[in-house]
Amino acid sequence: MTEALIIDDNRTTADALGQMLNVLGFKTRVAYGSRAAMTMLAGGLTPKFICLDINMPGVDGIEILGYLRREPHLIPVPVFVITSDDQPETRRKVMKLGANTMIIKPATIDALEDALKKVKFLK
């Protein structure tokens, strides 16, 4: 199984994402918020891919995405931004920063499966 990191301050959303990824055959770890995520990532965690929320208190997902794309061991890790913010400007911003895709909440198993196929984790 491949390990995914889910970063979302909403426990219900994070747990639902985890369940969907488990159904697709992936082991998951969850960071309930940006502080927990930064602790895990700074501690050397290098997941196979990351599901990242944007709107979180404190350090938001945009800042985390920037960090992911500056850290040498995290640069190649695919990032799927999963957010309720469906503004075209947000999509442009996260894609420019290096996200692999943006999924609008509520995420579906089909949307996750499509994102995983793009990065060749699923056929």
Across the structure, where does each feature detected by a protein language model lie?
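C-terminal output helix
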Residues: 107-116
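Active-site beta3 strand of CheY-like receiver
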Residues: 45-51
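Charged docking surfaces used in two-component/phosphorelay signaling
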Residues: 15-23
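Short hydrophobic/Thr-rich beta-strand motif most characteristic of the beta2 strand and flanking loop
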Residues: 25-32, 40
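Active-site residues of response regulator receiver
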Residues: 53, 83
